[in-house]
């Protein structure tokens, strides 16, 4: 592996970011739960869902970061700014297309996460880390730490941000984030076997 760098990304990198996240989150509880157990083409549904998540950040002009190994994107992070405005029309239209494709039940399952996340709000303005993912073949190489450091720098640079928030649905990640200095502010059970920590 050559020298790695964290780079600011933009809309032109969406396909590569989605590709990284589809690999990193392939078996992630949120994705499996929202898409549903009986779907015929999980890979395509996962791509549709993750593309929506990434495009939401693009429509809001949120920060996008990536770790590149030469020209190959191997890890990425997407964020929300503390002063983010309401959803633009393009995002609302994209959202309706997504739920038309994934179905009413998938939408309800996703909204159950949104309800849980909204019940543990952080009052102070902050930068929110929406997604952070590393290709599975590159796990254990410190790439998440590189991205988290860059995310923290983004927060420090923003005049209205008092810190960084995130949520995880993988209990193994809780101790990892605590190691990086995060504190649990909320926990909720979404469905049998599916929990979220903020």
Question: Which role does the model predict for each range below?
Answer:
Residues 5-19, 23, 27-31:
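A short beta-loop-alpha structural element at the N-terminal edge
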Residues 60-77:
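Conserved beta-hairpin
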Residues 73-133, 139, 192:
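Conserved acyl-donor/pantetheine-binding loop and adjacent beta-alpha core of acyl/acetyltransferases
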Residues 131-134, 140-153:
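Conserved acetyl-CoA-binding loop-helix of GNAT-fold acetyltransferases
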Residues 130-139, 165-175, 191-194:
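Conserved beta-strand-loop-alpha-helix junction that forms the acyl-donor binding cleft
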Residues 145, 157-160, 170-187:
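Conserved active-site alpha-helix within GNAT-family acetyltransferase domains
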Residues 125-127, 155-169:
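Conserved GNAT acetyl-CoA-binding A-motif
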Residues 39-63:
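Active-site rim helix/loop that mediates acceptor-substrate recognition in acyltransferases
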